[in-house]
């Protein structure tokens, strides 16, 4: 039987003169220019200390006459010790009064910049959303970090270079402050700032972030992308990747009909002005492509990205922390496409830049922010906490990361726990473990989200299983407190299989967390228990959580450890535990 794998360019329409010109002429120039910047970045890892100090004292000097700078004595700070003495470690609450004035137009409360492009909104994974000013320095560092990431990925995968890119971005104009400054996702702003000739490489239009219905965004991405040899997909959260793949298979008949007829299914709800601008492109019929895809479906019965996009396509998404359960499902949908972690990046700024496939570790981005580290287990807010610079870290040790940024955050505890996995030159390589907030301690066991995800990953691997969304949560009982695994009824097929997963996780937690083992042996903790939930529960729960915190779908991370002790009892009262 002939293969229908999309390995031949003949399966896609000819790219056309303009796109060919981009790859040949513009592509060569960009590769040379950005490659030179990447080499400078990699070379700089040999001397991070002077770069970090120049960045720190540059920020202090620049903002010394702001109200925050005067209130905290920036002008008198001469050394790192002075800086740490004048400005204790803090969360967002310290800067919020100044930030509120910036939102009202009083920029000098916190920043010396006269221009604020927008406010980046946090993802809503902790409490409520926070606003982060995007000034020129923030934007330059943000774009430089992505350039370094992309150039290194293309250098390692030259077949993918300067070919169509599918990137999911958010809306940078979700709302507006009282002073008229837009608030939203930085990805939306940077998409609008790209040169038109470069934008032709992107499958989705720059304002696709304004599509609020996620199913419609997936459908449009597939409708436009099925006719192009997409060679890079960027969506920070791997759940987005899987949902995209599933959406394409679920809607394969509608997609092929649209490609054949030159239409867009009316269930795809996109803004009218966007639809009008895409009308000419959507009206093009693709009978040859439809014929090929029909052959794929006849052969396999399904239609996944591995069937319609080249195998040299690069998947850019998070791979660390709790992402393992999603990544194990990738081969089914994406075959052997390369996976490149996009790095530890948040609305507050980029922290790491990964440079290898299948490795969540990345180089500390020493040019974007000034970084400090507190050994995990110490309280970062304590005046006696140990604070280290990047070059002082120890390989194998875990740390809480602190940021001082161009956006007015100083010694800011972002609650991220990272592990130093080694060094490039003298600059640390860091992998994300979990949010410091995702930490449970019923009776001294100090269970982290990292413990949970590692136990689940290993249990699934040993049992030869896959898992959908899940969470572990503390379950209070006056006599036998314990932890529960909360999964939907169809997650593992049968209750017996789910119980095997629970039993294996219980053993692994005891092996990898000596405090958990001690509390189990002493009877202070009962064993992990199984809680089955109705199908669709987690999708609804995540949706409600996103709505409550006004989070961004593309940035959202489902918590694999829920720390509230009443989670199980609340579900039981609502009759949701089966």
Label each residue range with its predicted role.
Residues 119-132, 244:
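Conserved adenylation A10 loop of the ANL superfamily
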Residues 54-119, 131, 137, 148-156, ...:
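Active-site diphosphate/adenylate-binding microenvironment
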Residues 167-173:
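N-terminal, positively charged nucleic-acid-binding surface of large information/translation enzymes
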Residues 128-129, 173, 437-440:
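A short, flexible beta-alpha/helix-coil linker loop
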């Amino acid at each position: 039987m002939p293969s229908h794998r999309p390995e031949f360019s003949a399966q896609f329409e000819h790219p056309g003169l303009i796109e060919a010109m981009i790859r040949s002429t513009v592509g060569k120039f960009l590769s040379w220019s950005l490659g030179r910047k990447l080499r400078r970045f990699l070379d700089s890892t040999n001397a991070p200390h002077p770069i970090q100090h120049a960045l720190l004292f540059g920020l202090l000097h620049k903002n010394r006459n702001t109200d925050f700078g005067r209130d905290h004595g920036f002008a008198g700070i001469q050394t790192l010790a002075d800086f740490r003495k004048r400005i204790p470690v803090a969360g967002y609450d310290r800067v919020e009064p100044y930030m509120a004035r910036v939102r009202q137009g009083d920029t000098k409360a916190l920043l010396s910049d006269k221009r604020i492009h927008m406010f980046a909104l946090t993802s809503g994974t902790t409490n409520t959303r926070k606003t982060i000013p995007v000034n020129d320095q923030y934007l330059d560092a943000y774009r430089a970090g992505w350039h370094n990431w992309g150039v290194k990925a293309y250098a390692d995968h030259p077949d993918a270079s300067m070919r169509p890119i599918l990137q999911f971005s958010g809306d940078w104009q979700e709302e507006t402050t009282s002073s008229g400054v837009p608030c939203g996702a930085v990805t939306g702003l940077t998409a609008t700032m790209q040169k038109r000739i470069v934008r032709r490489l992107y499958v989705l239009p720059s304002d696709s972030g304004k599509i609020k219905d996620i199913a419609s965004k997936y459908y449009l991405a597939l409708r436009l992308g099925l006719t192009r040899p997409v060679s890079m997909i960027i969506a920070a959260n791997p759940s987005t990747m899987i949902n995209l793949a599933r959406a394409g298979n679920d809607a394969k008949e509608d997609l092929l009909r649209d490609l054949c007829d030159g239409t867009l299914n009316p269930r795809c709800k996109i803004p009218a002005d966007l639809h009008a601008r895409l009308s000419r492109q959507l009206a093009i019929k693709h009978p040859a492509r439809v014929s090929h895809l029909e052959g794929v479906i006849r052969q396999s019965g399904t239609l996944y990205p591995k069937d319609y996009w080249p195998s040299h396509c690069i998947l850019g998404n998070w791979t660390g922390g709790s992402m393992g359960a999603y990544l194990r499902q990738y081969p089914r949908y994406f075959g052997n496409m390369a996976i490149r972690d996009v790095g530890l990046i948040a609305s507050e700024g980029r922290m790491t830049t990964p440079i290898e496939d299948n490795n969540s570790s990345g180089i500390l981005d020493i040019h974007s922010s000034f970084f400090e580290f507190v050994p995990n287990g110490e309280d970062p807010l304590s005046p006696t906490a140990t604070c280290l610079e990047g070059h002082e870290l120890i390989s194998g040790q875990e740390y809480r990361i602190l940021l001082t940024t161009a956006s007015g955050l100083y010694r800011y505890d972002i609650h991220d726990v990272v592990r130093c996995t080694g060094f490039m030159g003298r600059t640390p390589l860091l992998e994300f473990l979990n949010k410091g907030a995702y930490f449970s301690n019923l009776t001294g066991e100090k269970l982290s989200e990292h413990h949970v995800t590692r136990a689940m990953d290993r249990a699934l691997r040993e049992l030869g299983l896959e898992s959908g969304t899940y969470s572990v949560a503390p379950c209070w009982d006056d006599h036998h407190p314990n932890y529960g695994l909360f999964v939907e009824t169809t997650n593992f097929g049968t209750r017996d299989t789910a119980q095997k997963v629970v039993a294996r996780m219980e053993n692994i937690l005891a092996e990898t967390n000596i405090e958990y083992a001690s509390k189990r042996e002493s009877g202070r903790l009962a064993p992990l228990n199984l809680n089955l939930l109705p199908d669709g529960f987690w999708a609804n729960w995540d949706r409600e959580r996103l709505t409550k915190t006004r989070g961004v779908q593309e940035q959202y991370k489902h918590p694999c450890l829920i720390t509230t002790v009443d989670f199980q009892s609340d579900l039981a009262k609502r009759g949701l535990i089966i």
